[in-house]
């Protein structure tokens, strides 16, 4: 063997694209996002948040990684890629859009008004109308209706004779909640 002309086999093969154990949530109230996944053993995983490197995780010999990221308020774009010991970079994962929203949704009850008195049997079924966050889930005494893309919601409700307590809960995509309660009286 001619030692002067020895060739070294340089690793030019990029690592496999890292794989997340589960798809990140689309919306969260928390600014903290915990990620777990799999990548080439003893490599590094680079986390890009809004196209900027935000963290780096070491991959174990078993090929696993975990990382906690801090999200910005509003929309966040997340992508990750791997770097092996030779410095080869994998392709990036697809981009994940994650909305961080810590604000409770608005909840306005337009009709009926709190304290309203409804009379006559023909008026026993009332129309409840209100406004909340776009696409929020609205629960009225445990029964769900959805707000439309502009936040409007409307549903019919059957009143019992006497005082009726109506409990409203609005829940947005990030699971923030707003609660309200009104009382409506029904007389035959």
Question: Each predicted region: which residue ranges?
Answer:
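Ser/Thr-rich low-complexity repeats and stalk/linker segments
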Residues: 1-188
């Amino acid at each position: 063997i001619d030692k002067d002309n020895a060739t070294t086999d340089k690793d030019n093969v990029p690592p496999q694209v890292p794989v997340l154990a589960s798809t990140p949530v689309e919306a969260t109230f928390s600014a903290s996002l915990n990620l777990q996944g799999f990548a080439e053993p003893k490599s590094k995983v680079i986390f890009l948040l809004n196209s900027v490197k935000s963290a780096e995780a070491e991959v174990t010999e078993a090929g696993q990684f975990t990382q906690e990221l801090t999200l910005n308020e509003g929309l966040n774009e997340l992508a990750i890629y791997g770097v092996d010991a030779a410095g080869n970079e994998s392709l990036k994962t697809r981009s994940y859009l994650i909305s961080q929203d810590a604000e409770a949704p608005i909840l306005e009850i337009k009709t009926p008004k709190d304290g309203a008195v409804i009379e006559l049997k023909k008026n026993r079924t009332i129309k409840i109308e209100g406004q909340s966050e776009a696409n929020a889930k609205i629960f009225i005494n445990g029964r769900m209706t959805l707000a439309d893309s502009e936040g409007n919601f409307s549903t019919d409700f059957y009143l019992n004779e006497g005082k009726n307590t109506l409990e409203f809960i609005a829940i947005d995509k990030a699971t923030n909640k707003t609660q309200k309660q009104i009382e409506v009286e029904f007389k035959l």
